[in-house]
Regions:
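Glycine-rich phosphate/diphosphate-binding loop of Rossmann-like nucleotide-binding domains
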Residues: 48-60, 143-221
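Rossmann-like adenosine-cofactor binding region
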Residues: 196-273
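Anion-binding alpha/beta catalytic cores of soluble intermediary-metabolism enzymes, centered on
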Residues: 81, 98-169, 260
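Positively charged, low-complexity intrinsically disordered leader regions
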Residues: 1-56, 60
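Adenosine-phosphate binding glycine-rich loop
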Residues: 255-256, 261-304
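Active-site cofactor/substrate anionic-group-binding motifs, chiefly glycine-
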Residues: 42-43, 47-96
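Active-site-proximal loop->helix
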Residues: 70-93, 116, 166-169, 186-200
Length: 304
């Protein structure tokens, strides 16, 4: 693994290795024996979007592994925000840092940056992919279920970065994946092409009740990220009936898990009652961002 830009960069073996290392690092942290695997290493945390979990988990993770993490707001603190070409920023930061984490908009920009930087680059979220979040989701499922193989995962929501990454990650991990989106909100075409190679292990539906039937894990994410705008009003109409409620969860298995990448908009993509019922799972998932990202850093920079 040279970079982590999207889930399809990984083989099934690499995916499971990340989860194995993450579980080891989590156990070592709980025991107070975290190794200084990044001693003498520096990591640039370049963010073009606001962040709570991605920023803080990477900052803490680099510190716990003995490295130096520098946060920078790409829009307001770097010359890239005033027009410096991306290719110049990439080649400069690659001379200073051992690794760059970038949270940005266009996947194509991230891919170009990785080609030029000369150091490992990690996707902290783009409009196309969110691999760090999905690795945390898979870790949480494996911790609680003991295996990923054969588990039925149902994603309900917008066919955006979370859907794209869950589909690929779930299928690579041996899961059965159902994605439920309204018409007009399908996942990326290349993701669907990848998924259809898995035959009956993948289904794309528009009816939430059909999708959650006998699911082991239900996953949702915010789909209304610009409240008060015409786009928000349109999405509220288009996603009517896509809220994960107690009644909808009755169609899943009695012990089904519920995951949410956060932030959660209670009353929109998920009811407040269902969120609180599954809060332990959701906040385990949030914690596991720290552990999987430490694992990715350790693999890329320490050769684990």
């Amino acid at each position: 693994m040279k970079h982590l830009l999207k889930m399809s960069d990984l083989s099934p073996a690499e995916l499971h290795h990340i989860l194995d290392v993450a579980e080891e690092l989590k156990a070592e942290q709980k025991a107070g024996t975290t190794p200084a695997l990044l001693k003498g290493r520096s990591v640039a945390l370049m963010f073009s979007k606001n962040s709570t979990r991605t920023r803080t988990s990477f900052e803490v993770g680099v510190y716990q592994l003995g490295g130096l993490g520098n946060y920078m707001n790409a829009a307001t603190e770097l010359q890239s925000g005033r027009g410096e070409p991306l290719k110049d920023t990439a080649r400069v930061l690659g001379r200073y840092y051992d690794c760059v984490v970038w949270r940005t908009y266009r996947q194509s920009d991230l891919e170009e940056f990785a080609e030029l930087a000369g150091v490992p680059v990690i996707n902290g979220l783009t409009d196309y992919a969110h691999p760090c979040q999905v690795l945390a989701d898979l870790m949480t499922i494996r911790e609680r279920r003991g295996t990923l193989e054969g588990q039925k995962l149902c994603f309900i929501g917008d066919g955006c970065s979370m859907a794209n990454s869950l589909i690929v990650g779930g299928l690579l991990a041996g899961m059965r994946v159902t994605c439920v989106c309204p018409e007009g909100y399908r996942p990326a075409a290349d993701v669907l092409m990848f998924a259809h190679r898995y035959g009956e292990k993948f289904h794309l539906l528009t009816a939430p009740a059909e999708g959650v039937k006998d699911a082991d894990v239900v996953v949702t994410a915010a789909w209304n990220t610009a409240p008060g705008t015409p786009e928000s009003e349109r999405r509220l109409r288009d996603f009517a009936g896509f809220q994960v409620t107690g009644r909808l969860m009755e169609g899943a298995k009695p012990d089904a898990m519920l995951l949410h990448c956060l932030p959660a908009h209670r009353g929109e993509e998920i009811s407040a009652a269902v969120f609180e019922e599954h809060a332990d799972e959701i906040f385990d998932e949030a914690e596991n961002r720290l552990h999987v990202q430490k694992a990715v850093l350790a693999i890329l920079l320490a050769g684990l």
